[in-house]
């Protein structure tokens, strides 16, 4: 009898937890900005203009490992010594994948010559479920007169969206490892649907 009560209670707790979990909620997702690294994945500066020192690369790596890496990287990129380094002209696309639903692609551009461009138009999706099938794939390029340079592709998982929703503000998700440090962060604003 005690086992039945415990099993019944544990089953009720599991159902109750599942019903209130973020995986059953719907949100609006907005990608606000990206933070781009100092160099392309091959180590050359954007548009092959300027010189990026080994010290700059090491300092950026240290900033990426800081407790609040997004702030440390933003402060690092604002250093006057980096003003002479060419910055990319970001353009790209973001595609939302939801299980078997058709992909929902959004294209955008960033401000020219910026290490941390806001995206225009900002990719937005409404009524996005926070479940394991949800992911967003982002592909970025440095727009050039001839032959755009690949900045990188990264994936935003459902768990990343849930963390952004929990933060309640623009959440800077570190994506540097996915892109070989060519793209460092992506800004996500995830809010509950009314």
Ranges and model annotations:
Residues 78-163:
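Peripheral membrane lipid-binding modules
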Residues 20-91:
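C2/C2-like lipid-binding beta-sandwich modules
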Residues 15-16:
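C-terminal motif of bacterial Sec signal peptides marking the signal peptidase cleavage site
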Residues 26, 120-125, 135, 168-170, ...:
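Intrinsic-disorder/low-complexity, polar/charged segments enriched in Ser/Thr/Lys/Arg/Asp/Glu/Gln
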Residues 2-7:
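Sec-dependent signal peptide recognition
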Residues 34-37, 143-194:
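C2-type phospholipid-binding modules
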Residues 25-27, 88-90, 132-134, 180-184:
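Residues at beta-strand starts and edge strands
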């Amino acid at each position: 009898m005690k086992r039945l009560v415990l099993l019944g209670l544990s089953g009720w707790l599991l159902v109750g937890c599942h019903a209130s979990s973020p995986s059953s909620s719907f949100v609006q997702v907005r990608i606000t900005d990206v933070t781009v690294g100092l160099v392309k994945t091959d180590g050359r500066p954007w548009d092959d203009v300027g010189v990026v020192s080994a010290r700059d690369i090491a300092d950026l790596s240290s900033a990426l490992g800081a407790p609040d890496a997004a702030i440390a990287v933003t402060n690092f990129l604002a250093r006057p010594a980096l003003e002479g380094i060419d910055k990319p002209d970001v353009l790209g696309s973001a595609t939302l994948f939801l299980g078997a639903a058709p992909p929902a692609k959004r294209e955008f551009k960033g401000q020219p010559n910026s290490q941390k461009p806001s995206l225009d138009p900002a990719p937005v999706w409404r009524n996005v479920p926070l479940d394991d099938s949800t992911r967003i794939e982002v592909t970025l390029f440095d727009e050039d007169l001839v032959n755009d340079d690949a900045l990188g592709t990264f994936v935003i998982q459902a768990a990343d969206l849930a963390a952004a929703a929990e933060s309640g503000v623009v959440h800077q998700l570190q994506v540097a490892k996915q892109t070989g440090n060519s793209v460092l962060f992506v800004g996500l604003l995830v809010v509950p649907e009314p």
